[in-house]
Amino acid sequence: MGYGNRRPLRTWVAFTAFFAMVVSAMSPQAEAAPPAGSAAASSYFMYVATYTDGKSKSKGIYSYRFDAKTGKLTPIGLAAEIVNPGWLSTDPTHRFLYAVTERPNERGPGAYTKDGSVSSYAIDPKTGALTFLNKVNSHGGGPCYILVDPTGKTLFLANYGTGSVVSFAIKPDGSIGERISFDQHSGSSVDHARQEGPHAHAAVLSPDHRFLFVPDLGTDQVKIYKVDAVKGTFSPNDPAYVTMKPGLGPRHFTFGKDGRFAYVLCEMGSSVVVFSYDAAKGSLTTIQTAYNLPADFKGIDNSAEIEVDRSGRFLYASNRGHDSITVYAIDPAKGTLTLVQNIPTQGSIPRNFALDPTGKYVVVGNQISNELLVFDVNQKYGTLKPTGEKVDLDEPICIVFVPAA
């Protein structure tokens, strides 16, 4: 969950950036991609969660105006005072925002053992102001990830510290209701310092919403659950999990645009594992492991975030320690990754980043150097370039966009 001290595997993907750009530009999918922003708004509210303990001067969730035509960030201010909001998520209508709370001063080895919480807020579409609705117990330690299902009626939550996954009902007014389902992970893996027990790190629904995938950093597995979309319940699938290479430490999970392939970001291995996905069975089959860092990198790194762009042609992964974002081209037929670029984030520990809804910009949160930076996205090649837009903010750790009225 936090920035660890494990040396990564350092095998480099054996393709040059130039070759990847040429292949990407020649692909039929690249030619058919719609122009970024063609069906999106131009003005957004951007909410940023921050750590609030230790030396941080931040106090919770901050809001900004984001101009998708220029990439300019305009600070609005503190939107919600809340302790250590480790992750943010919105409902499908963008009327409500949800935030987990880690307990204060519990970062580091052996932390996250006491229950945290999850809070709900109503979003003012004109001003971006947040109105607190309610807060409930997370039923586990160190909550680190939340997801609202497409109906807006169920919230899924992963507890990193105690290694569990939970679902909650969402009431019509956006507030969080009763706990619906719960599953406690068990097991460990090869790194006794960081994998002494289960550490659920995300909860992601399949494109058809029938399955829930939960990468567990502590057990080197991705747990797979069947979901009852009407009731909001989940139960172990058959197969109930896929096992990763020992020590990779799976952190985050995403699907490709067409849903045929899945990508798991491995924190401890600084890598992305590519899977083919059987939508009928909910099963995953490994087809590639791509390592994010140059072969000559000798330092410590822990990869943090992963996202596929809206065209489905590129995948982005952030690396804490190497302090970079790795850009891959996605083969539309095979789902495999080819290196395009590895670009410095111009700061320390890029814990989180987000592609804006138009796909024209990436906003990066450098946690330790305390800043938000905007990068331009080359629509043809997927490459990133800093725009020069920078905003200071202590310990930014999660970024979400909401259309402004």
Feature-to-residue mapping (PLM):
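Bacterial N-terminal signal peptides
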Residues: 13-25
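An edge-strand/N-cap motif at the start of beta-rich repeat modules
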Residues: 37-66
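Beta-rich, blade/repeat-based domains predominating
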Residues: 55-58, 82-92, 139-151, 186-209, ...
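Short loop/turn segments immediately following beta-strands, especially the blade-tip
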Residues: 65-71, 121-128, 168-176, 226-234, ...
